[in-house]
Amino acid sequence: MASRLVAGLQVLALAGTATAVLTWDEAYAKANTALARITQQDKVSLVSGIGWDKGPCVGNTAPVSAINYPQLCLQDGPTGVRFGTGVTAFTPGIQAASTWDVELMRQRGQFQAEEQKGCGVHVMLTPVAGALGKIPEGGRNWEGFGVDPYLAGIAMEVTIEGQQSVGVQATAKHYLLNEQELNRNTMSSNVDDRTLHELYLWPFADAVRANVASVMCSYNKINGSWACENEHAMQKLLKDELGFKGYVMSDWNAQHTTTGSANAGMDMTMPGSDFNGGNVLWGPQLNTAVNNNQVARTRLDDMARRVLAAWYLTEQDKGYPPINIRANVQGNHKENVRAVARDGIVLLKNDAGALPFKAPRRLAIVGSASVANPRGINSCVDRGCNEGALGMGWGSGTTNYPYFSAPADAIRARAQQDGATVTLSASDSTADVANTVRDADAAIVFLTSNSGEGYLLVDGSYGDRLNLDPLHNGNQLVQAVAQANKNTIVVVHSVGPLVLESILSTPGVTAVVWAGLPGQESGNALVDVLYGSVSPSGKLPYTIARATADYGTAIVPGDDNFPEGLFVDYRHFDRANIQPRFEFGYGLSYTNFTYSNIKVASTVRSGPATGPVVSGGRADLWETVATVTATVTNSGGVAGAEVAQLYVSYPKGGSVPETPPRQLRGFNKLKLAPGASGTATFNIRRRDLSYWHVGQQNWVVPAGAFGLEVGASSRDLRLKESITVV
C-alpha cells in the first residue's frame, strides 16, 4: 500500500486541488475546544437533520453560529452530485472495480469530491462497500466495488483518500449486511461472527484505515437488531475494534427510536424527519431524552464531538464554497470517466481475431440499448427506466447526465473516418432484423440488464433483478442477428453477471464485449476498444456462471441467515468444484502475457494480532509480513495492460477452520509495450494471512504452509510458491 499511496499523492499534487488534512488527534483537539463553547441545544443541532426537503441538499443540519459552523450539506453520491445540473455522470463503483487500477480509482474519487466541493457539499454519501454482492441479483451491487472483500477494500481505501484529499467528508455505506432490496426495511441479516469479519466488515476496515469521516448505518436488522440501533455493530465492531473516530449517520429514515439509537452508538440522524415531514426522533426529542437522563450528556458530547472532528479533519472550517447544487463543476473530469469506462471493459470472447475492427466497410448496429433514451437522457427520475443505452443503474446513487455518448453515435462517427457505412436498427424486435444485418461486415448487438433501489419499479423489478437473463428478449435478438450475420459482436451493458449460455452457444457470435456501466462516456469508451485504440484490460469483479443456481445464493423473502457463510462467488465455485463460464478476475486482451520468476520473502510468525488499536484495527494487521514478486511480459504484438493477481491458500488441517480454497490477496496492473516486461509486486499484510478466531475474538495467523499463486484470473494461475509459518 505504501507504494500506491506515494504514487497517488503524486497524482493529486499534480492536479493542484488536493488539500492537507489534519490527523484525528488534531481534529479532536479542535473539536473539544469548540464543544466547550456551545450549548446543549447546539449539540443537538449538530447531530440532527432539519427534516426532509427542508434545505438545498438531500440532508441538512442547522448552523451553529457560536463556532462559525455552517449549515451542513449532505448529498448523494456514488455516480456524482445527485440532482446537479452542471456535473459529471461518473462511472459506478462496479466499473471502477473492473479496471483493477488503483490510480484511476483514486482519481475518480478525487474528481467526484472536487465536484461535490464545488457545489458546496460538505458530506458526500459515497463510497459503497455494502451491498458486497453475495447475491448476483442484488439491486444495488453496481454501486459498490464487487464481491471480493479484498478488492472492495482496496477500492474503498484509495477512493476515500482521493475524496478527502480535496476536503470533502466521505461516507462509507451501507453498514452492514444490506445485501438485497426486497424487504430491506424489515428483514434481519443473520450472520456468524467469522463470516461477518472476513467478508462484510473487511472493506469497512479499509475505509476506517483511510480515515473516512462518516459511516452510514443501513435499513436492515443485523442478527435481530436494527442496524442503526445495533450496539454491537456500531460501538463494539466499528468504534472499538476498528478504531473508527468519525460519526455514524443513519440512512434516510433508517432510525427507529430516540434513545435506542443514541445509546447504541448512532451519532447523526438523517434527514431528521420522515418523508412526510413527521416522525421526528431526535431534535427536540433527543434534547428531552438528555434532560431526562435517558441519554447521558457524555453520549451527546461524544456524538457532537465526532461530527465536529470530521469537519475539522477535512479542514472545512477554513473557508468553503457556498451551497449551489446547480454549479457547473465538470472541469476535465470526463477524461476519468472515459478512462474508467474504457479500462473497465472486459473482453469475454474473441474468436479468430474478430476484434479489434480492421476498417470494416459496412457495419450494422442492433438494439434499443445502442442509442440514447429517446425520451431524453434524464427523462426518468433517478434513472428509473431501462430505455436506451445503459450507463448506470437506478436509485439514489444516480446523477443527471450532462450529455451521453451513445454507442451508435460514437461508432458511426468512428466508422465515417474509414468511409464506412452504418445501418442502425434501434429496436429489440427480431421481425426484420435480418435485412438490417445481412450484408454487413460485422453486426453489433447491444444488450442490457438493469437494477437499482427498491423505491422505483422498472421492468417489473423493485430493485433486485428478477433473473440473470438480458432484458427485452436479448437472447432471441442475438440469435436472430447471428443467423443472418456470421460475424456478430455482442456488447453487454449490465449491473452484474448474466447467464450467457444461450448467446455463447449461438453460431455466428464471434465476440462478446462486457462493457459494464460506463457513465456518460459510454460510446467513446467502447469505440476505443472496438477499434483497437487501446487493448481491453478489464477483469471481472465477480463470476459469470453457467446457470443461476450455480451461485448458491438468491434473494430471500424473509430474514436471511447467510447459510453460505464464507463461500460466496468464486469461493463457493472453488469449494463446490463448479466450473464457471467466466471466472472471477477473467478478461482477454488483444495481446498475450507470460508470467515467470516468482520470488517470495517472508517474516511472518503465527499467532494473534497484538498491536494497539488504530484506525482500521490492530496496528500490526496492516504491517507487511511477506512480499511476492513475479515478472510479467507482453509477449504479443500490441501494447496492453495486464492485471496480475495473487491468491492465497491457507494451511489445511490442524486447528484452522474450513477456509475457501483460495482468496485474492493482491493485484497489480502493469502497462506494457510489446516485448516489454514488468515486475508485479504484492505486499502481503498480516491481515491477509489471518483468519478471525471466534474464540479469541481476534485475528490469528495459523501455523503451516500457505499456498501462493499468481496469474491472470482466479483459475488461470501460472506461478506457484509457498511459505511455511511457524
UniProtKB/Swiss-Prot annotation:
Q: State the EC number(s).
A: 3.2.1.21
Q: Name one GO cellular component term.
A: extracellular region
Identify the InterPro entries for this entry: Cellulose_deg_GH3, Fn3-like, Glyco_hydro_3_C, Glyco_hydro_3_C_sf, Glyco_hydro_3_N, Glyco_hydro_3_N_sf, Glycoside_hydrolase_SF, Ig-like_fold
Positions bearing carbohydrate: N223, N592
Record flagged with keyword Transport: no
Whether Nucleotide-binding counts among this entry's keywords is no
Q: From its record, what is one biological process in GO terms?
A: cellulose catabolic process
Which enzyme type, at the first EC level?
hydrolase
User: Mind listing the GO molecular function terms for this protein?
Assistant: beta-glucosidase activity
On pH dependence, the entry says:
Optimum pH is 5.5.
Q: How does activity depend on temperature?
A: Optimum temperature is 50 degrees Celsius.
What triggers expression? The transcript levels are constant during infection.
Localization recorded for this chain is: Secreted
What metabolic or biological pathway is this protein involved in?
A: Glycan metabolism; cellulose degradation
Where is this protein chiefly located? secreted
UniProt xrefs under Gene3D superfamilies: Glycoside hydrolase family 3 C-terminal domain (3.40.50.1700), Glycoside hydrolase, family 3, N-terminal domain (3.20.20.300), Immunoglobulins (2.60.40.10)
Span of the signal peptide: 1-20
Q: Please indicate which superkingdom the organism of origin belongs to.
A: Eukaryota
Reactions the enzyme catalyzes? Hydrolysis of terminal, non-reducing beta-D-glucosyl residues with release of beta-D-glucose
What keywords appear on the UniProt entry? Carbohydrate metabolism, Cellulose degradation, Glycoprotein, Glycosidase, Hydrolase, Polysaccharide degradation, Secreted, Signal
Q: Which family does it belong to?
A: Belongs to the glycosyl hydrolase 3 family.
According to its UniProt entry, the function of this protein is described as: Beta-glucosidases are one of a number of cellulolytic enzymes involved in the degradation of cellulosic biomass. Catalyzes the last step releasing glucose from the inhibitory cellobiose. Has a broad substrate specificity but preferentially hydrolyzes highly polymerized 1,3- and 1,4-beta-glucans.
Q: What else is known?
A: The biological conversion of cellulose to glucose generally requires three types of hydrolytic enzymes: (1) Endoglucanases which cut internal beta-1,4-glucosidic bonds; (2) Exocellobiohydrolases that cut the disaccharide cellobiose from the non-reducing end of the cellulose polymer chain; (3) Beta-1,4-glucosidases which hydrolyze the cellobiose and other short cello-oligosaccharides to glucose.
Provide the protein name.
Answer: Beta-glucosidase cel3A
Organism of this sequence: Pyricularia oryzae (strain 70-15 / ATCC MYA-4617 / FGSC 8958) (Rice blast fungus)
